[in-house]
Amino acid sequence: MSIRSWLRGFFVDTPFAQVVNLEDKQVVVTGASPGSLGYETARTLARWGAQVVVTSRGDVSAIVQALQEQLEAEGVAARVTGHPLDLCDAESVSEFARWYREHCGDRLDVLVNNAGVHLDLMAKWKEPRLSDDGHELQWRTNYLGTVQLTHELLPLLKQTGERHGDARVVNVGSQIHSRSRNEALFDADTSYNSWKFYGNIDLNQRK
């Protein structure tokens, strides 16, 4: 955070999204662990009336319970369910899509692709860590897994849009794309840096 941004916080009110009536809307929010953007997104959308499905690699039932208790304490009728999802695992992604179709019907108004990982915050990795199917771990999770999930749920989104007039995919990103290096996409000899790789993934999500 810049000094200018820090000082600005003392004089300018934090902007909040305008409340939207989401009654009857069905929303999936990936990566909803407590304390995350996904968790607060799910809580806000549920407060606005949406039926929300949250995902996580962790204990989803505990996340759902925490959301329900928090919403009920705020006087909101909780409409939150959840299911495990590991974007690093292609079968987990397909299983979630099957579960959603079987348990949540033929409607999906919004898919919020929030889940992502960065497991090398201190940039100590000298070589890429690979997923079980041979992809760089962050690429497999943040990009390939997200694209697969979107592709598998896209028919429901299209159907919902045709029937109800609107449906959308929201990809959550960050400013880390500014650390990307385009030449790394074409130069196989470029040394590995997890932050630059993460930035390239974030840049790809914006295309």
Say what each PLM segment does:
Residues F11-K207:
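Rossmann-fold NAD(P)H-dependent dehydrogenase/reductase core
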Residues M1-D13:
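N-terminal membrane-anchoring alpha-helices
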